[in-house]
């Protein structure tokens, strides 16, 4: 196979990806091997590839490819999430562009448009993942609203309802006025906002005075049904048992007492608006207060408000400030910073709202799912996220699972003509239950009305590791029994509650065991300034453009260079460039080796025999390090170990030791050993850099059709002779010392040198030292030659006689000039350090730096003086 002079990723990547697909290397079926299973965190069907996906899927692919090469039956299941809120918003926007409102359509008509949109745009991200090299079993591609997944979701809802864990009721929920749906607590992001604190006057009934309330939300006073004071607050005792009048509204409301009220906040008086504040709602329940819902679903004021009807809540805030001021009912306004809840999906401030919703009781499920993580039955990498998990599990609230949308799994509850409802998996079963419940055998489906709401998107994805293998509908099928529990989950810590915790709950509830054995938490990809990458900041590169520019292997490596588990990733294009440079290094090394002429008749040189023995041990040592790093999920460390092995040990040392002289042949034994090493290196690198390694492995020797590095065996650990490796490190220091002398004295590499040794020395490596340094002789001496330049390695002195290789007078002049400069520099540093004023005022770091300059200068002066002494002997 001909190897091009330059590596061209564009030519190589598509060719080998298609080859892998054609040969079915990504496919998996249950067999006798140990399974290795990963389920993809399903990206939104609306999505396109971003840097977070790139990182997450690179890590998954590394794990899957390595498992495959370890002889396991690797199964990586891809899929997408229907993403109710995000997808519905996209469809609504597209319809708006055509002049169609959602309200103009029936549910079925809207869903037809949604499915059309999904068919057009859904799956784009999965196609893009192929460019990255993702080795998923594409035949298994799933969608959270496909038939099997939908059946699973409905079945689980009915089951949990029958168990008494799902209930329906009016509760305070987080309402998204833009998406027009309830949200779970986890879908609310709290941000620090620059707000105002308004001090409002409430007239005390039957008195001249006012009670003053401080609030950030004057627009909600139309929903006030009480004022509350702390019974232990001396400054508000005069309000006990009184009534006050809501400003502008004119409604009399009672003053109630509860120690919930913070005496230190504002005036110590609290306005109670049970329909629009979580804490006020609890007070309302406790004191049986009426609730007045003054907001429409879209955040405008409703008829119940009586004032400002139809106006947006934030417009009302501005208007009511003016109206209160004009009425003399606004005492003052202060600047105030507070945390405001925003919808994670639409980024608008949420509205606490009383609403009839469906909820899932979480306490029972959380208790079961906490212990396995805390006892490390399910391992978290890094383990710091165990505390985050525990805190959430111990403070869990019921999960609001209903959403006021049309795109999603419709709740299988059917309302009866006379009130009440039944819950069933199908319309037929619902009708049977309805007839029984109503005692009316003549009921038809037209008499029943299915709940309009759909389930929270996470209610389908929490079943993902089970439903992908149809384990809900067919709990004893071959695939679920073979592939479950899955092996590793790779995900971001931002969805530890949304998804990870809930999957663990579902796993124990429906399989009686963990859904995965380990969770690898990736970090957040940030830019060079430490900002999270986002469209709005314009700081996120297009991953496909990066692949085009640097090649998929270059980008994969760039990501992994910066990606230790659980730490944020400071991403820079320069990392991809480093990855591309490594590709070129591998390519050029391969071309060098394959360009050698082999001569079967020549014996293996001693230096080459030593090099082969040494590199075999170096390789075995790295294999052990890589295995250890993978066992601890330190993938970046594993990659760096192979990177250094190839770049430093193989390219800079081994190839230099064995390469033949210019236009000279190489012996067969060394050549075959070198090809064997290259083969092992390509195997180690393949999970990280699949494309270039496959291209070179195929060119390493003739291959049969259907052979692939993808399914080749990973190199195994062997016994390592650490003493031999340690001894070779001394060789490196000796070679480095001689090369430094060449550099300092401008002696060309073609000029052979002598090496004299004073002290202990292991002669076993002399052949390597002679070759690497171009030495004419290596000899042990009692005393080095006059004019020789020397260096120490451990306690042994190595000297290079310079003889006629340099002009002694010129060299002495240069050294004297350098000595003069260094002494002058040292004097200036000492003057500074001797200045008490400087020493007393300068920061400790500056003093430390000056002392380092002193030590460096003294060291250089000593070295120069020794060199002068050697030349003048």
Swiss-Prot record:
Keyword entries, A-Z: Aminoacyl-tRNA synthetase, ATP-binding, Coiled coil, Cytoplasm, Ligase, Nucleotide-binding, Protein biosynthesis
Main localization (coarse): cytoplasm
Ubl conjugation keyword on record: no
Pfam families for this protein: Anticodon_1 (PF08264), tRNA-synt_1 (PF00133), Val_tRNA-synt_C (PF10458)
Membrane-crossing residue ranges in chain numbering: none
Motif ('HIGH' region): 43-53
Motif segment ('KMSKS' region): 532-536
One GO process term, biological-process aspect: valyl-tRNA aminoacylation
Enzyme Commission no: 6.1.1.9
Positions bound to ATP: 535
Subunit structure: Monomer.
The protein, known as: Valine--tRNA ligase
Organism from which the protein derives: Parabacteroides distasonis (strain ATCC 8503 / DSM 20701 / CIP 104284 / JCM 5825 / NCTC 11152)
Biological classification of the source: Bacteria, Pseudomonadati, Bacteroidota, Bacteroidia, Bacteroidales
Gene that this sequence comes from: valS
């Amino acid at each position: 196979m001909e190897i091009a002079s330059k590596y061209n990723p564009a030519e190589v990547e598509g060719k080998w990806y298609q080859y892998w697909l054609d040969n079915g290397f990504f496919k998996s079926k249950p067999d006798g091997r140990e399974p290795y299973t990963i389920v993809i965190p399903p990206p939104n069907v609306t999505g396109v590839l971003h840097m977070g996906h790139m990182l997450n899927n690179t890590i998954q692919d590394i794990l899957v490819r390595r498992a495959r090469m370890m002889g396991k039956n690797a199964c990586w299941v891809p899929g997408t999430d229907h993403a109710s809120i995000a997808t519905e918003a996209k469809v609504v926007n597209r319809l708006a562009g055509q002049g169609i409102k959602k309200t103009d359509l029936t549910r079925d008509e809207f869903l037809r448009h949604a499915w059309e949109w999904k068919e057009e745009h859904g799956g784009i991200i999965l196609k893009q993942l192929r460019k990255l090299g993702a080795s998923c079993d594409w035949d298994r591609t799933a969608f959270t609203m496909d038939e099997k997944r939908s059946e699973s979701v409905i079945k689980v809802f009915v089951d949990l309802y029958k168990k008494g864990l799902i209930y329906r009721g009016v509760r305070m929920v987080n309402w998204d006025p833009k998406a027009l749906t309830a949200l779970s607590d986890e879908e609310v992001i709290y941000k620090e906002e620059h707000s105002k604190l308004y001090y409002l006057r409430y007239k005390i009934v039957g008195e001249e005075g006012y009670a003053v309330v401080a609030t950030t939300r004057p627009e909600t006073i139309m929903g006030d049904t009480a004022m509350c004071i702390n019974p232990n607050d001396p400054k508000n005792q005069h309000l006990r048992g009184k009534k006050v009048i809501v400003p502008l509204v004119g409604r009399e409301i009672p003053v109630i007492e509860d120690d919930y009220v913070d005496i230190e906040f504002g005036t110590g008086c609290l306005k109670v608006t049970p329909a629009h504040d979580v804490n006020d709602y609890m007070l309302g329940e406790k004191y049986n207060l009426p609730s007045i819902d003054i907001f429409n679903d879209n955040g405008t004021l409703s008829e119940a408000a009586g004032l400002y009807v139809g106006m947006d809540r934030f417009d009302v805030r501005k208007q009511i400030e003016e109206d209160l001021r004009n009425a003399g009912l606004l005492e003052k306004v202060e600047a105030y910073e507070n945390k405001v809840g925003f919808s994670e999906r639409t980024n608008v401030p949420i509205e606490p709202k009383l609403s009839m919703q469906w909820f899932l009781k979480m306490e029972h499920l959380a208790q079961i799912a906490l212990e396995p993580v805390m006892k490390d039955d399910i391992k978290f990498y890094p383990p710091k996220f165990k505390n985050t998990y525990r805190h959430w599990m111990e403070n869990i609230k019921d999960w609001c699972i209903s959403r006021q949308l049309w795109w999603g799994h419709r709740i299988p509850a059917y309302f009866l003509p006379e009130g009440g409802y039944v819950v069933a998996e199908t319309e037929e079963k619902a009708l049977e239950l309805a007839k029984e419940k109503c005692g009316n055998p003549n009921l038809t489906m037209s008499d029943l009305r299915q709940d309009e709401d759909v389930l929270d998107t996470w209610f389908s994805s929490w079943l993902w590791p089970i439903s992908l293998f149809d384990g809900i509908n067919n709990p004893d099928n071959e695939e679920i029994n073979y592939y479950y529990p899955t092996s590793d989950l790779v995900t971001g810590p931002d969805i530890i509650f949304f998804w990870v915790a809930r999957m663990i709950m579902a796993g124990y509830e429906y399989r009686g065991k963990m859904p995965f054995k380990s969770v690898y938490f990736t970090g957040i990809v940030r830019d060079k300034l430490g900002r999270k990458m986002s469209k709005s900041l314009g700081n996120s590169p297009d991953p496909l453009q990066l692949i085009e520019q640097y090649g998929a292997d270059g980008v994969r490596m760039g990501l992994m260079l910066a990606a230790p588990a659980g730490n944020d990733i400071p991403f820079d294009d320069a990392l991809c460039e480093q990855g591309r440079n490594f590709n070129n290094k591998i390519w050029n090394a391969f071309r060098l080796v394959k360009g050698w002429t082999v001569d079967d008749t020549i014996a293996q040189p001693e230096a080459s025999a030593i090099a082969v023995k040494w590199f075999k041990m170096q390789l075995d040592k790295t294999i052990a390090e890589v295995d250890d790093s993978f066992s601890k999920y330190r993938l970046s460390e594993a990659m760096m170990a192979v990177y250094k092995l190839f770049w430093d040990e193989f390219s800079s040392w081994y190839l230099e030791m064995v390469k033949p002289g210019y236009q000279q042949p190489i012996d067969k034994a060394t050549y075959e050993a070198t090809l064997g090493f290259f083969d092992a290196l390509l195997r180690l690198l393949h999970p990280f850099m699949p494309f270039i390694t496959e291209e070179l492995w195929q060119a390493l020797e003739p291959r049969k059709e259907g052979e692939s590095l993808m399914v080749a065996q990973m190199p195994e650990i062997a016994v390592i002779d650490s003493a031999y490796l340690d001894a070779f490190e001394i060789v490196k220091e000796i070679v480095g010392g001689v090369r430094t002398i060449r550099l300092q004295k401008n002696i060309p590499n073609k000029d052979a040198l002598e090496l004299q040794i004073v002290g202990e020395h292991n002669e076993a490596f002399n052949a390597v030292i002679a070759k690497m340094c171009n030495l004419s002789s290596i000899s042990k001496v009692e005393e080095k030659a006059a004019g020789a330049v020397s260096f120490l390695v451990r306690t042994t002195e190595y000297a290079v006689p310079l003889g006629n290789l340099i002009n002694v007078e010129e060299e002495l002049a240069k050294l004297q000039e350098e000595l003069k400069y260094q002494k002058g520099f040292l004097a200036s540093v000492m003057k500074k350090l001797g200045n008490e004023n400087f020493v007393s005022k300068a920061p400790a770091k500056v003093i430390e730096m000056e002392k380092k300059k002193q030590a460096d200068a003294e060291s250089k002066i000593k070295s120069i003086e020794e060199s002068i002494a050697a030349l003048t002997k």
